[in-house]
């Protein structure tokens, strides 16, 4: 019996080895749509987790690893630190003359000085637990209320703090806040689309094969979005909202933005609708590893 099992075990080991080597032997050159090209704008920026335009030439970058916000001149590659001493910054919003900064477990508001530095910080919200994930992007609704994306502390569990695995609303002045949507395992970002509403990404559980797909969701206030009850047999649990878009499981659909009407990038015309672009991180937890998309 053992002799018969040996070829099977050997084959499984070989397949496992091929899977691990696949990212190295499959090549790292990006596949690009005809008529477009990929250019290096800058490098050595630490662990970039957000990109926000300050103006036509200056790009603000959240450096998760360095704990800072960096200003980058894309024409000269000159850079300077606008704010440091942060704990894993993941989000930045420029709003009404202030910089709203999301870091691990905390949301703060800073005045923007004449020289562009972020000063006189005021903590809006603190004490959000972190674990497998943390608090991510911060955006603003048309009425001025902030939307803060808060990840789960685990892969699959019942959270002790309802502010985890949720979208939170936050008053930009007082810091008053609450849960806007629940059952959102790890939503990294969202975008407001005029005449439609707020669309947001959400990344599902790991270590369960190619299940579940990553999600693009449409925000309905006070709605639940399924986690942690979204089993393979019940991908959309009763009483929860289904996604409006899906992507490869475990690849982390993170940043999302609206394609400008006059953009040269592929997309729908205004008469046809609108187009969203997302940044996909990639994963080795898929059946075949996937790179950035």
Task: Name each model feature, range by range.
Residues 24-32, 135, 152-156, 165-175, ...:
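Beta-propeller domain segments
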Residues 60-62, 101-102, 147-149, 199-202, ...:
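Residue position within the beta-strands of beta-propeller blades
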Residues 60-75:
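Beta-propeller domains
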Residues 105-141, 149-152:
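Asp-box/WD-like beta-propeller blade repeats and closely related beta-sheet repeat scaffolds
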